[in-house]
């Protein structure tokens, strides 16, 4: 009996008809189109865009040069050099992120013990030359300073899940 059913399903192209019905149903459904530069879709607080380095409220940079983000980066996009300061703490002298290599996975953000490196909601950035997409420590700190309010809001919204 099952052989007969299988024969008719195969002979009558049941799967093909089922697929054509699905296509026909969606062909006449309302289209959803977002005209991107003019219209923007809502973003999640967890959106992974352009990187930023944060500072403490007293103005000191948060990065303690533990190099966990450099070690965990699967694309090897982060380069860190550090020095010992006179007070015994370690701070970065060089912190570069090559955005041409970065895959925006967020591992650097997750591994940071002091919430220094974060990924912002910024997705519109460009470079005219390859070197323009290598962000230095000063550039990352400038992004962090400029968007600190939004970063703090996003971190607060996500705090319950961390």
Swiss-Prot record:
<keyword id="KW-0004">4Fe-4S</keyword>
<keyword id="KW-1003">Cell membrane</keyword>
<dbReference type="Pfam" id="PF12838">
    <property type="entry name" value="Fer4_7"/>
</dbReference>
<feature type="binding site">
    <location>
        <position position="73"/>
    </location>
    <ligand>
        <name>[4Fe-4S] cluster 2</name>
    </ligand>
</feature>
<keyword id="KW-0472">Membrane</keyword>
<feature type="binding site">
    <location>
        <position position="69"/>
    </location>
    <ligand>
        <name>[4Fe-4S] cluster 1</name>
    </ligand>
</feature>
<keyword id="KW-0677">Repeat</keyword>
<feature type="binding site">
    <location>
        <position position="112"/>
    </location>
    <ligand>
        <name>[4Fe-4S] cluster 1</name>
    </ligand>
</feature>
<dbReference type="GO" id="GO:0005506">
    <property type="term" value="F:iron ion binding"/>
</dbReference>
<keyword id="KW-0411">Iron-sulfur</keyword>
<feature type="domain" description="4Fe-4S ferredoxin-type 2">
    <location>
        <begin position="93"/>
        <end position="122"/>
    </location>
</feature>
<keyword id="KW-0874">Quinone</keyword>
<keyword id="KW-0997">Cell inner membrane</keyword>
<comment type="function">
    <text>NDH-1 shuttles electrons from NADH, via FMN and iron-sulfur (Fe-S) centers, to quinones in the respiratory chain. The immediate electron acceptor for the enzyme in this species is believed to be ubiquinone. Couples the redox reaction to proton translocation (for every two electrons transferred, four hydrogen ions are translocated across the cytoplasmic membrane), and thus conserves the redox energy in a proton gradient.</text>
</comment>
<dbReference type="InterPro" id="IPR010226">
    <property type="entry name" value="NADH_quinone_OxRdtase_chainI"/>
</dbReference>
<feature type="binding site">
    <location>
        <position position="63"/>
    </location>
    <ligand>
        <name>[4Fe-4S] cluster 1</name>
    </ligand>
</feature>
<keyword id="KW-0479">Metal-binding</keyword>
<protein>
    <recommendedName>
        <fullName>NADH-quinone oxidoreductase subunit I 2</fullName>
        <ecNumber>7.1.1.-</ecNumber>
    </recommendedName>
</protein>
<feature type="binding site">
    <location>
        <position position="102"/>
    </location>
    <ligand>
        <name>[4Fe-4S] cluster 2</name>
    </ligand>
</feature>
<dbReference type="GO" id="GO:0048038">
    <property type="term" value="F:quinone binding"/>
</dbReference>
<dbReference type="GO" id="GO:0050136">
    <property type="term" value="F:NADH:ubiquinone reductase (non-electrogenic) activity"/>
</dbReference>
<keyword id="KW-0830">Ubiquinone</keyword>
<feature type="domain" description="4Fe-4S ferredoxin-type 1">
    <location>
        <begin position="53"/>
        <end position="83"/>
    </location>
</feature>
<feature type="binding site">
    <location>
        <position position="66"/>
    </location>
    <ligand>
        <name>[4Fe-4S] cluster 1</name>
    </ligand>
</feature>
<feature type="binding site">
    <location>
        <position position="108"/>
    </location>
    <ligand>
        <name>[4Fe-4S] cluster 2</name>
    </ligand>
</feature>
<dbReference type="InterPro" id="IPR017896">
    <property type="entry name" value="4Fe4S_Fe-S-bd"/>
</dbReference>
<dbReference type="GO" id="GO:0005886">
    <property type="term" value="C:plasma membrane"/>
</dbReference>
<keyword id="KW-0520">NAD</keyword>
<feature type="binding site">
    <location>
        <position position="105"/>
    </location>
    <ligand>
        <name>[4Fe-4S] cluster 2</name>
    </ligand>
</feature>
<comment type="similarity">
    <text>Belongs to the complex I 23 kDa subunit family.</text>
</comment>
<keyword id="KW-0408">Iron</keyword>
<dbReference type="GO" id="GO:0009060">
    <property type="term" value="P:aerobic respiration"/>
</dbReference>
<dbReference type="GO" id="GO:0051539">
    <property type="term" value="F:4 iron, 4 sulfur cluster binding"/>
</dbReference>
<comment type="subunit">
    <text>NDH-1 is composed of 14 different subunits. Subunits NuoA, H, J, K, L, M, N constitute the membrane sector of the complex.</text>
</comment>
<dbReference type="InterPro" id="IPR017900">
    <property type="entry name" value="4Fe4S_Fe_S_CS"/>
</dbReference>
<keyword id="KW-1278">Translocase</keyword>
């Amino acid at each position: 009996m099952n052989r007969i059913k299988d024969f008719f399903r195969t002979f009558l192209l049941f799967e093909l008809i089922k697929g054509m019905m699905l296509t026909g149903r969606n062909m006449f459904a309302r289209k959803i189109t977002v005209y991107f530069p003019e219209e923007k879709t809502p973003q999640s607080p967890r959106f992974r865009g352009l990187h930023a380095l944060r500072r403490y409220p007293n103005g000191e940079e948060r990065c303690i040069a533990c190099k966990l983000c450099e070690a965990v980066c699967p694309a090897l996009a982060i380069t860190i050099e550090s020095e010992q300061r006179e007070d015994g703490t370690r701070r970065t002298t060089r912190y570069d992120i090559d955005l041409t290599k970065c895959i925006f996975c967020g591992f650097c953000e997750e591994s940071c013990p002091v919430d220094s490196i974060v990924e912002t909601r910024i997705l519109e950035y460009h470079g005219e030359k390859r070197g323009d997409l290598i962000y230095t420590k000063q550039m990352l700190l400038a992004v962090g300073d400029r968007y600190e309010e939004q970063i703090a809001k996003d971190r607060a919204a996500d705090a319950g899940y961390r």
